[in-house]
Amino acid sequence: MRKLFNIFLFVLCIVAIAGCNDTESSESKLEIKAVNTNFQATGGKGYIQLQSTGNITADVDVDWCVLKEVNPNEVVFEVKENTGYSGRNALLTISNGVKTEAFNINQSGAVFIFGKDEWMLRTDNKATTLPIKLQSSFDYTIDIPAEAQEWLSFEQNAKGINFKVKENTSGKMRGAIVNVAAKDRSASYQVIQYDVDELTGTWQGMFSDGQMNYGLKDVIIEKQEDGTYLLSNILTGLPYKLKAKAIDNCLAFGAGQNLGVFEDNLYLSFEILSSDLYYVKDPSVTISLGPVMLTDGTFVFAFSGIKESDPFGFVFRVYEDAKLQKVIDNLSIFINCILFKEDIIQ
């Protein structure tokens, strides 16, 4: 009889334990219904929607993700702006005292992408639209100087900005340096409107050979009857002239120009120094002379490229033969060469 009684008690204990486990399971309910945990750089409101029992607590391991509300139905948090280049992650944990769930909060880095080859926008005197590509995570401001707003405006679109340029009837070159900024990032653009014939005249100048700086005096640019241009006295006191064509509203000087006899029995060649510092004689390769606007609003004419792949400078090379096959030496290397009116740079 006692043995049967002990068996009966054992069965009751098992039933009681099972009942306790069922009760505990029902009291520790923590079901996830919906989440919003991925964010752009601009940040925003996130949430974890749930069904739960018990006392809900939440914790996050970074200060840029801030808990706003915690209750049995929802955990709400706010992700701050990310102005950095890199994306970032946070860990959010939710618990009801028995069960715990963990969530990764992901935020992408800030984007400010612009065309590095679009910083110089040169155009003739006709009314025109100059498009540039620009992508930004944040809203950006476009600052056109007050003195240029009468003739220069802009329109934003999904791909970037369209600069709207009115017809130039002033009879002189005009330009503006436009700053575009988003948070702590920015880009500057030069918009210059002019007639290419304004590059003709007599100019002073300066250049570097990579070691020292030198001055230039009375460099002359003339337009020919056939529409081409001649530049003379770039080698001060020597009679050599460089030929150029008007391309993209600049004067383009082709490589490989045979300038003729140099010191009786030698020959002189105009060649281009490429961006990777090779001497180039291919006539299809050119270096351009065009206006650049200084911060004080004045203009200089620069033998400088707009793109990173544009030529680094130009060089006059001495050869033994008229076919320019046997080079002897460099006569002069021109880097960062600019031309200007005498009263511009003192």
Q: Where does each model-flagged region fall?
A:
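Bacterial Sec-dependent N-terminal signal peptides
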Residues: 2-5, 10-42, 97, 102-104, ...
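Proline-enriched interdomain boundary motifs that mark the N-terminal boundary
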Residues: 27-35, 110-119
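Short, solvent-exposed loop/linker segments at the N-terminal edge
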Residues: 38-43, 120-126
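Surface-exposed binding patches on compact interaction domains or structured appendages
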Residues: 45-76, 135-162
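Short, hydrophobic beta-strand segments
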Residues: 77-82, 134, 163-169
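A short beta-strand micro-motif common to beta-rich folds, especially ectodomain repeats
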Residues: 86-98, 171-184
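Short beta-strand edge segments in extracellular beta-sheet folds
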Residues: 104-112, 122, 188-198
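Ser/Thr/Gly/Pro-rich, low-complexity flexible regions
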Residues: 192-346
